[in-house]
Amino acid sequence: MAIVDVVVIPVGTDGPSVSKYIAEIQTKLKEYKAQGKIDYQLTPMNTLIEGDLKDLFEVVQAIHELPFDKGLSRVCTNIRIDDRRDKSRNMNEKVKAVEKYLNDGGN
Protein backbone atom coordinates (compact mmCIF):
# COMPACT_ATOMS: atom_id res chain seq x y z
CA MET A 1 0.00 0.00 0.00
CA ALA A 2 1.33 3.40 -0.96
CA ILE A 3 0.70 6.80 0.58
CA VAL A 4 0.47 9.99 -1.44
CA ASP A 5 0.87 13.48 -0.01
CA VAL A 6 -0.91 15.78 -2.45
CA VAL A 7 -1.47 19.52 -2.62
CA VAL A 8 -3.73 20.89 -5.36
CA ILE A 9 -3.23 24.62 -5.87
CA PRO A 10 -5.87 26.38 -7.98
CA VAL A 11 -4.30 29.40 -9.70
CA GLY A 12 -6.29 32.42 -10.85
CA THR A 13 -9.16 32.21 -8.40
CA ASP A 14 -11.27 35.27 -7.59
CA GLY A 15 -9.64 35.64 -4.15
CA PRO A 16 -7.04 34.23 -1.77
CA SER A 17 -9.29 31.51 -0.32
CA VAL A 18 -9.33 28.11 -1.99
CA SER A 19 -11.56 26.35 0.56
CA LYS A 20 -14.39 25.74 -1.92
CA TYR A 21 -11.99 23.97 -4.28
CA ILE A 22 -10.54 21.87 -1.48
CA ALA A 23 -14.05 20.93 -0.34
CA GLU A 24 -14.80 19.69 -3.84
CA ILE A 25 -11.64 17.63 -3.81
CA GLN A 26 -12.62 16.11 -0.47
CA THR A 27 -16.05 15.23 -1.88
CA LYS A 28 -14.39 13.42 -4.80
CA LEU A 29 -12.10 11.57 -2.38
CA LYS A 30 -15.13 10.51 -0.38
CA GLU A 31 -16.52 8.89 -3.55
CA TYR A 32 -13.31 6.93 -4.09
CA LYS A 33 -13.31 5.86 -0.44
CA ALA A 34 -16.90 4.62 -0.77
CA GLN A 35 -15.70 2.45 -3.68
CA GLY A 36 -13.08 0.94 -1.37
CA LYS A 37 -10.17 2.25 -3.45
CA ILE A 38 -8.57 4.62 -0.93
CA ASP A 39 -8.47 6.04 2.53
CA TYR A 40 -7.57 9.69 3.04
CA GLN A 41 -6.92 12.36 5.63
CA LEU A 42 -7.31 16.11 5.20
CA THR A 43 -4.74 18.25 7.01
CA PRO A 44 -4.47 22.05 7.11
CA MET A 45 -1.73 22.03 4.44
CA ASN A 46 -2.33 18.92 2.31
CA THR A 47 -4.26 15.71 1.85
CA LEU A 48 -2.83 12.26 2.53
CA ILE A 49 -4.24 9.41 0.47
CA GLU A 50 -3.42 5.71 0.81
CA GLY A 51 -4.19 2.81 -1.46
CA ASP A 52 -2.89 0.80 -4.38
CA LEU A 53 -0.45 2.90 -6.42
CA LYS A 54 -2.44 2.44 -9.63
CA ASP A 55 -5.59 3.71 -7.91
CA LEU A 56 -3.68 6.60 -6.36
CA PHE A 57 -2.53 7.86 -9.76
CA GLU A 58 -6.14 7.69 -10.97
CA VAL A 59 -7.34 9.63 -7.93
CA VAL A 60 -4.62 12.28 -8.19
CA GLN A 61 -5.47 12.88 -11.84
CA ALA A 62 -9.17 13.16 -10.99
CA ILE A 63 -8.65 15.71 -8.22
CA HIS A 64 -6.13 17.66 -10.32
CA GLU A 65 -8.84 18.08 -12.99
CA LEU A 66 -11.54 19.40 -10.65
CA PRO A 67 -10.48 23.09 -10.63
CA PHE A 68 -10.29 23.02 -14.43
CA ASP A 69 -13.88 21.73 -14.45
CA LYS A 70 -14.80 24.90 -12.53
CA GLY A 71 -13.36 27.16 -15.21
CA LEU A 72 -9.83 27.76 -13.98
CA SER A 73 -7.05 27.82 -16.55
CA ARG A 74 -4.16 26.79 -14.31
CA VAL A 75 -3.65 24.26 -11.53
CA CYS A 76 -0.40 23.35 -9.79
CA THR A 77 -0.35 19.97 -8.06
CA ASN A 78 2.48 18.79 -5.80
CA ILE A 79 2.78 15.06 -5.15
CA ARG A 80 5.01 12.98 -2.87
CA ILE A 81 4.74 9.20 -2.89
CA ASP A 82 5.77 6.81 -0.11
CA ASP A 83 5.71 3.32 -1.64
CA ARG A 84 7.18 0.79 0.78
CA ARG A 85 7.00 -2.78 -0.47
CA ASP A 86 8.73 -4.82 2.23
CA LYS A 87 5.95 -4.14 4.76
CA SER A 88 2.30 -3.24 4.46
CA ARG A 89 1.57 -0.33 6.79
CA ASN A 90 -1.21 2.20 6.63
CA MET A 91 -1.03 5.83 7.73
CA ASN A 92 -2.24 5.12 11.26
CA GLU A 93 0.28 2.34 11.79
CA LYS A 94 3.12 4.62 10.68
CA VAL A 95 2.07 7.26 13.20
CA LYS A 96 1.75 4.65 15.95
CA ALA A 97 5.29 3.43 15.23
CA VAL A 98 6.65 6.93 15.88
CA GLU A 99 4.47 7.37 18.97
CA LYS A 100 5.87 4.12 20.34
CA TYR A 101 9.36 5.63 20.25
CA LEU A 102 8.10 8.80 21.89
CA ASN A 103 6.40 6.88 24.69
CA ASP A 104 8.87 4.12 25.48
CA GLY A 105 11.93 4.49 23.28
CA GLY A 106 10.64 1.93 20.79
CA ASN A 107 10.76 -1.04 23.14
UniProtKB/Swiss-Prot annotation:
SUPFAM superfamilies: MTH1187/YkoF-like (SSF89957). It holds the Pfam family Thiamine_BP. GO terms for cellular component: cytosol. InterPro entries: MTH1187/YkoF-like, Thiamine_BP, UPF0045_domain. Belongs to the UPF0045 family. This is UPF0045 protein in glkA 3'region. It comes from Staphylococcus xylosus. The lineage of its organism: Bacteria, Bacillati, Bacillota, Bacilli, Bacillales.
